[in-house]
Amino acid sequence: ERLPVMLYPDEPFDCHGVYSGSALVEDGMLYLYYTGNVKHPGEYDYIKQGRGHNVCLATSRDAIHLDNKRCLMYNQDYPAGLTCHVRDPKVFALDGRYYMVLGARTLDDHGEVLVFESADKLHWNHINTITTPKAFGYMWECPDLFELDGQWFLAVSPQGIACQNVYGCGYFALQGDWRTDCTLSEFHALDDGFDYYAPQSFAAADGRRIQFGWMGMPDADYTNPTVEYGWQHCLTLPRVLTQDGNGCLLQAPAAELNALRGEARQPAD
């Protein structure tokens, strides 16, 4: 069913784009956390100056009509030493509190993830920063922090690393408490293909951890045929994540995809 556009960049805090984020569902209310992009007029590089990357929140009861829309954090609310590139809030609940991870780029081009905590989903405090001892890319986009059988994982899409595909994405296994102090394992790629980026996961009602990726290739030299209809790009097929007990993720197609299968065909000799 084709539904109307729900989120428009129609406020001063998101006037140049509703950028990616995440959703939280509680008590029949949908909380949509996203990045509000603002490009201030002037002679700026829009990396270290001139850009607002705001954490915004929209709420809805039916996922069609908005009840409220507000800005929760502006550039000045982030830790010192960062560029204007802070984005992609992923929010989840744990032990009666709420947590948010944000991708960030430092002034010396070091990718990292900011961890925030909240008691009410509205007011957020920075409690930790997760990164590598040496720079691993200049920006970590679309972070996702999740736990599988007692092991925590941090998935990121780092910009500025050498990889065989166009857009690299992968994950670290975490040792320690990510709320206070932790170290990261070796980085593992999530996909060896060329069109899988910015993956995000959620916990299904039956406990499975399901992940979708972005099938986009925005800088490719081909044009998607759907552009003339006002949209482009897709989400990938859902994958169920498990772990092998040694800090590595395993991926399998979601069982629901079986219902889409048709009659099997054998290749001709």
Predicted regions and their residues:
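Beta-rich carbohydrate-recognition and catalytic domains
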Residues: E1-D88, A93-G137, E147-D192, M215-A268
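Repeated scaffold domains used in trafficking and secretory/extracellular systems
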Residues: Y138-P143, Y197-P199
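Catalytic and ligand-binding motifs that coordinate phosphates/metal ions
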Residues: G193-Y197, F202-A203
